[in-house]
Amino acid sequence: TFNRDIPGELELNHDCVENISCTPEVEIRHCYFTRTSTRGTLMTTPRKVVIADNTYYKTGMSAILIEGDAEGWYESGPVNDVLIQNNIFIGCAYSGGPENAVIALHPSNMVVDAERPVHRNVRIIGNTFRTFGNPVLYAKSTKDLIFKKNHVECTSSDDFRQKPLFILNGCKGVVIRENKLEEVCDKKMEFRQ
């Protein structure tokens, strides 16, 4: 039941409604994710999320995927407070995921507008990435995104050598600083929208 009238501009078979009173806070610490054919962690909740002190080893797709899906699977909507800290990512996203990125913020919105972000307040701090040259971060429709004090080591695989480390699509308020990027890494960023 709703505590007030449903807005008249909602369209049947077009808009989605989420019961945000039934969404969890999530804390994932001291875990070891390995050799999955899919992503290591799929996360979508509007409440507080902490993913810290974990190891992600050779996840087939993105080690961490943050969705926001109202197109196919109808998973939870936007995230508003995510901390990804002190994790180790080794050889992840070798077989797929959004842009083959180790961490992907990939909501399903079809219209990408930096003034109308889906996700907010995502901090990726103090992690170690050992990657084969694929992107460490793909973010779409995200506001107030921080990527700092991370260490990125790239191996010499020709498969992903041309991929930028960061791909940002319709994002606003992005801070990427104080990171250690090994020389072999392609330090390019790609901006879309």
Positions of predicted regions on the chain:
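Short, recurring structural edge motifs at helix starts
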Residues: 14-17, 38-40, 70-75, 106-114, ...
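Parallel beta-helix/beta-solenoid
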Residues: 23, 28, 36, 41, ...
